[in-house]
Amino acid sequence: MNVPRETIAAIATAQGRGGVGIVRISGPLAGAAAKAISGRELKPRFAHYGPFLSEQEEVLDEGIVLYFPGPNSFTGEDVLELQGHGGPIVLDMLLQRCLELGCRLARPGEFSERAFLNDKLDLAQAEAIADLIEASSAQAARNALRSLQGAFSQRVYNLTEQLIALRIYVEAAIDFPEEEIDFLADGHVLSMLDAVRDELSTVLREAGQGALLRDGMTVVIAGRPNAGKSSLLNALAGREAAIVTDIAGTTRDILREHIHIDGMPLHVVDTAGLRDTEDQVEKIGVERALKAISEADRVLLVVDATAAEAADPFALWPEFLEQRPDPAKVTLIRNKADLTGEPIALETCDDGHVTISLSAMAAGSGLELLRDHLKACMGYEQTSESSFSARRRHLEALHYASAALEHGRAQLTLAGAGELLAEDLRQAQQSLGEITGAFSSDDLLGRIFSSFCIGK
């Protein structure tokens, strides 16, 4: 790749005061800067303690200097790290010294960008650095570290290799028709294609779990008026985020609350009560509620356990089932269990949905059970070696690849169109390449790395 030859410098530690502060340099001038600032020749990859010198050989600070000649460094270039005292004035003096020696200020994420351009890490690994820094829970940090170590990338590479093998077989049959390979009669292409589709489906599911841990899960609270939806929102938020009254229809619009459960981000959405109404404002609220339900990662369907309709809550509002057809993403909340006397409990039903009996208004009434359930939905304390962090753009690329394979399979089985299958396989491979950076536009790379910290 065409890697810039300018030497860059930046403060690599967070703003503010601390015991230690780091200034990082990368580029062809790093070796000369190391000698000028330390006043001596440095042994590569060894820590040297001593003064940091100005142009007039005045002592700016003292600390540890480390020199890593390329390509055996983080960026693949010559890298210098100055580890001094963590005061902002001291660090700024060291940074100014680097600029005097011919360095320029690094852009946000430029060190990681150079590591990517020098094939020291792929794009998914580079993004994992930022995810590890921004992790809001121990599980999110573990997943980000696994992605940084290449767990996610390896899954994508394995899929890509399978696609390449399949493309070779398909395109050989197209280019050499005299070999008379019959796609359908042979059965080999279909079996290979189905194997790739199955593996892609598994990776997509695991990536979705990783994205929930990174970006947060959108939880929509839905149900009839006066079922206790707003009370449940307040209980989860730990404050009076929503107005609670005995008057049906108090909540008429979407109310959003961002909360954390053991460091795990949740975007909780309270919605208008689901009912037929002639009130135009409330009707708009119901429409927005149904839209929120269709977009949710998880739906908490709240029912009043004291009401007769609680016996079959899903039958009360067929539009709900139309918007959220997957029962595995629905948690039925039987609220007001303290009034019915039913035990606080969680039950997984035959169709896949979960039922929790609790009371949103009573202390110690099952809310901890609900919190644990929501954490489990996000993959909290997941010990699987397959867990990794992922981003929304990764999911989009995986979905696009999956759609291309589905389309290619249909073209093959319905029309025997090997040429169309070959094009779909190419598109699927390109989508996977966008995850690791094998196929990425300059605009995409710029957007990704500009979101990083300066010095990373």
UniProtKB/Swiss-Prot annotation:
Cofactor(s) needed, names only, are:
K(+)
Q: Kindly list any coiled-coil regions of this protein.
A: none
Q: Which residue intervals define the domain TrmE-type G in the entry? A: 216-379
Principal location listed in the UniProt entry = cytoplasm
Q: Which residues bind K(+)?
A: 226, 245, 247, 250
Sites where the protein binds (6S)-5-formyl-5,6,7,8-tetrahydrofolate: 24, 81, 120, 456
A GO cellular component term found in this entry reads: cytosol
List positions binding GTP.
226-231, 245-251, 270-273, 335-338
Which BP terms does GO give this entry? tRNA methylation; tRNA wobble uridine modification
Q: Does the keyword Nuclease apply?
A: no
UniProt keywords, alphabetically = Cytoplasm, GTP-binding, Hydrolase, Magnesium, Metal-binding, Nucleotide-binding, Potassium, tRNA processing
Question: Cellular location of this protein?
Answer: Cytoplasm
Positions bound to Mg(2+)? 230, 251
Q: What is its EC number?
A: 3.6.-.-
- Name the InterPro entries for this protein: G_TrmE, GTP-bd, GTP-bd_TrmE_N, GTPase_MnmE, MnmE_dom2, MnmE_helical, P-loop_NTPase, Small_GTP-bd
What are this entry's molecular-function GO terms? GTP binding; GTPase activity; metal ion binding
Q: What is written in the cofactor note of this entry?
A: Binds 1 potassium ion per subunit.
GTP-binding recorded as keyword: yes
The protein's job, in short, is: Exhibits a very high intrinsic GTPase hydrolysis rate. Involved in the addition of a carboxymethylaminomethyl (cmnm) group at the wobble position (U34) of certain tRNAs, forming tRNA-cmnm(5)s(2)U34.
Q: How does it assemble?
A: Homodimer. Heterotetramer of two MnmE and two MnmG subunits.
Which family is this sequence assigned to?
Belongs to the TRAFAC class TrmE-Era-EngA-EngB-Septin-like GTPase superfamily. TrmE GTPase family.
What is the name attached to this protein's record?
A: tRNA modification GTPase MnmE
Source species = Pseudomonas fluorescens (strain ATCC BAA-477 / NRRL B-23932 / Pf-5)
